[in-house]
Amino acid sequence: MEVILLERVAKLGQMGETVKVRPGFARNYLLARGKALRATEANKKRFEDQRIQLEARNLERRNEAQAVAEKLDGQSFVLIRQSGETGVLYGSVSTRDLAEVLTQNGFTVGRDQFSLNQPIKTLGLHTVPVVLHPEVEVTVTVNVARSPEEAERQARGESTVVRDELDLEELGLEVGAALAEAGPEGEER
């Protein structure tokens, strides 16, 4: 199916281009969200008549996104979550959680504006891209920790995950002593 793009769509094209896409993608995403029109003669004429208005609206949205981007770029946000000793979260941090944290901090960002391939499932610092406009993208740092104190340590670069630290020399002596006591058949003497 051919459609006329009403705004820039990543990996597809610029505003005003006529592109061929699969019918399901056109119906369920592009047409449903107002990002495109079917490429009929009537719609082509309508687009050309409204092109100046669409470009002005796109420029206005881009300028608004740029203003938010200047404040948001490079910001760090802390999320407190429960996790195991190895640093794996019991749940996960999804785009919904990220949108909620940014909203609490005064930024209006929808969950569909985050570019997360999969939810965050570990403690630590994570960089997350935020697409505010098809032409404006920023990154924020998400600090996932068990407590505010741990978040501060992570921000300074200290490791907070507990690792089993064994003294190998001491372990070798204990194993050797146990084997000597057991005898050749593995039985206690």
Swiss-Prot record:
InterPro entries: Ribosomal_bL9 (IPR000244), Ribosomal_bL9/RNase_H1_N (IPR009027), Ribosomal_bL9_bac/chp (IPR020594), Ribosomal_bL9_C (IPR020069), Ribosomal_bL9_C_sf (IPR036791), Ribosomal_bL9_N (IPR020070), Ribosomal_bL9_N_sf (IPR036935). GO terms for molecular function: rRNA binding; structural constituent of ribosome. PROSITE patterns: RIBOSOMAL_L9 (PS00651). GO terms for biological process: translation. SUPFAM superfamilies: L9 N-domain-like, Ribosomal protein L9 C-domain. Keywords: Ribonucleoprotein, Ribosomal protein, RNA-binding, rRNA-binding. Pfam families: Ribosomal_L9_C, Ribosomal_L9_N. It comes from the Bacteria. One of its GO terms (cellular component) is ribosome. Disulfide bonds: none annotated. NCBIfam families: L9 (TIGR00158). Binds to the 23S rRNA. PANTHER family: 50S RIBOSOMAL PROTEIN L9. Belongs to the bacterial ribosomal protein bL9 family. This is Large ribosomal subunit protein bL9. The gene is rplI.
